Amino acid sequence: MKETDRKIDKVRETSGSWANNHGRFAEEYFFNSFEKGKQNFFGEKFYDIKNNLKGTETNDEFDIVMLNGSSVGLVEVKFKVHENDIPKVLKQANTFRANFPKYKNHKVYLGLATLSFYPELEEACIKQGIAIIKQVGETVVINDKHLKAF
């Protein structure tokens, strides 16, 4: 029985490692895409881009943060995203302002980047005013026509 438990723990550890690697791959892919010229986003030009920015007041981490003098772009990155991830994305505008009060008067735009979108998820993002960012071949496609500032 102990041997079975040990093997199950090893499988869990290995599968968790795969998931983390996929997540890191997606974050690096989208960050590099934004850093290499995709800084015109949400109809604005962003001059500073940061990845994996840690909050000062909470344990929040912001995958991709783009900044200019009046706006903040926050992009949550997932290897594979689900509709139940949308509330976390929507919460980010407030948690970012709580963590970084100097941006409290900035417009905040939200985006969701993933390597795997499905139609119902895209529709849910559109309804909430979240930008859709996805890989199509070797290109990153951004649908931000329906955006709203938070």
Residue ranges and their predicted role:
Residues 95-105:
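Arginine/glycine-rich "motif VI" loop of SF2 helicases in the C-terminal RecA-like domain
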Residues 43-69:
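Active-site metal-binding core of divalent-cation-utilizing nuclease and nuclease-like domains
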Residues 1-36:
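Amphipathic, low-proline, heptad-repeat alpha-helices and/or compositionally biased low-complexity charged/polar-rich
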Residues 36-42:
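Short helix-loop-beta junction
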Residues 34, 62-85, 89-90, 94:
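Conserved catalytic cores of phosphodiester-cleaving nucleases, focusing on short active-site segments
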Residues 109-150:
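Domain-level recognition of nuclease-like catalytic cores that cleave nucleotide substrates
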Residues 48-51, 76, 112, 134:
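Structural signal for conserved beta-strand scaffold positions within catalytic alpha/beta enzyme cores
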